[in-house]
Amino acid sequence: MDTRFHCVYLLTSLDPQCAGEYYIGYTVDPIRRLRQHNGEIVSGAWRTKRRGRPWELLCCVSGFGEDRIALKFEWCWQHPTKSTRLKTQMTQLRGVHRLPYAVGVLHLLLRADLFARLQLTLHIFEPERVGRVVAELQGRVPSISPLVATSLLRIEEITKERFMSLYLDGVSGDGTAGDGCVYFVTAPLSSQPDVDAPSRRVRSCRYLSEEDVFRQHARVKELLEANQCPCALCSLPLRSPYFVRCYRTPFCALRAHLACLAMWFTYETMQKRDVTMGQSTRNERSGEYSNKIKDDSNDGTMDAHASGRQLHSLSVNNADFSSSRDAGSILDSSGHISAFEESRCASSPSLTLLPCQPCPCPLCDEPLQWGALVHDLKRRAVLEKRWMERQRREKIEAALAERLQRLQNSSLTERKSRRKATPALGQKRNRGEYCGDTVGDGGKEAVTNWRARAMDGCDSWNDTNDFSHSVSLPPSRDEGYACDSSRRGVGGSKHTTRMTDEGKNDSITDICDCVLQLTEFNLDEWLDA
């Protein structure tokens, strides 16, 4: 389980002789990597060491769940003309070079179908420099619109110090972790914790070392395999991999059924709508009463005592409304449906189980996107299915190889035993001996009769009943084989052996065909749906 911070960064040269030069790379610690490129510490890139120092970190893209996806993003950013996702759009950047070209490719890459479905974050460390480059890009290519924050893409302007404290440092309370250690990853928060926020945020966001993460992952894996890992919402057991999880895993322990989380999304949407409608209704009623009081005071028909009673009635009405609203009552004093509930029922659309808006996580309050959660579920389900089918095929192939080896060993042993039972060439058999066995008196008489009929010109192959019935013990398989071998000589032995091997090969081929028919599978490519 990979728990590191994966990001793809963009560097630009501060050397006036290399103005506009850029470098794109992948790392788990962009601040430490910047020091390596500038030569402060060892293990820098050869390209940045040769020319262009000092380098400046402009931005980086994070939010990749594993290094494979981050490396794919890096390759597409470095080779946009070879990428199948960008090569058809690269005509828009014709005539754009150097740093504006890299920024333009980033704009196109973040809008590609593959990466637009991920919850990514664009960290901008030099907003002024990036703003000038984007303005230059807009002047040359007006068709490329600037990046804006969406439900899946988050854009933040941040300093290197705050970036270190939020994403890379291992500071928890008064304790400090190793300097530059990427295995101490913090749990980033979208905003500062509120004093009135529930304790679930504090309980979910904590600093974990690599050993703790591996230990927790192993424990959860054991529970999932035993069907004992409970759902975070309904406490019923989960079945791997058909469950959804927070994108901040392993820093958030949310693991729930798909239907449970969908109902949570619907519940949160209804709560937000009720709060918004209640606030707007209270504002409207307060405005009506204030306007009425103002009109009465302007006319001069209301004295101080009357105005006091009006204000008192206003406060009482507002208190009654809030209390009835908290109690969940939908009836007014006369027993009819209140105007607020009537307007709510009339304006509220039909609720569906499929969420359409982002919702905060039940444990860490981070915004969750339903499309990203389902995409992650489909990806894990396809990988799990492929892994199980691969294991099944390997087991079948191992069983077939073992059976084939056993058949070969048995055929070799049988050949050796047959060679021992076959009489040598030129060896004389005793009279009355048939294929190594002594023929009885009835057999001798049958042989004599057969020879007499052959001398008379009779067809020996059409009349063999006397011989077949008179022989006391028919020869066995080995004896018959030995007899045929002794009669035909070496050529007959080779022909018989070849026929036997062909029969065995045919049987093994039939077995393989039958078994391989069972291993044929058709993957449900959910990712292409």
Curated annotation (Swiss-Prot):
This is Structure-specific endonuclease subunit SLX1 homolog 1. Catalytic subunit of a heterodimeric structure-specific endonuclease that resolves DNA secondary structures generated during DNA repair and recombination. Has endonuclease activity towards branched DNA substrates, introducing single-strand cuts in duplex DNA close to junctions with ss-DNA. One of its GO terms (molecular function) is zinc ion binding. Its main location: nucleus. GO terms for cellular component: Slx1-Slx4 complex. GO terms for biological process: DNA recombination; DNA repair. It comes from the Eukaryota. Disulfide bonds: none annotated. It is an enzyme of class 3 (hydrolase). Forms a heterodimer with a member of the SLX4 family. InterPro entries: GIY-YIG_endonuc (IPR000305), GIY-YIG_endonuc_sf (IPR035901), Slx1 (IPR027520), SLX1_endonuclease (IPR050381). Residues 275-305, 409-437, 470-501 are annotated as: Disordered. Keywords: DNA damage, DNA recombination, DNA repair, Endonuclease, Hydrolase, Metal-binding, Nuclease, Nucleus, Zinc, Zinc-finger. Residues 282-297 have a biased composition (Basic and acidic residues). Residues 4-89 form the GIY-YIG domain. It is found in: Nucleus. The keyword Nucleus applies. A zinc finger (SLX1-type) spans 231-364. PANTHER family: STRUCTURE-SPECIFIC ENDONUCLEASE SUBUNIT SLX1. Its EC number is 3.1.-.-. Belongs to the SLX1 family.
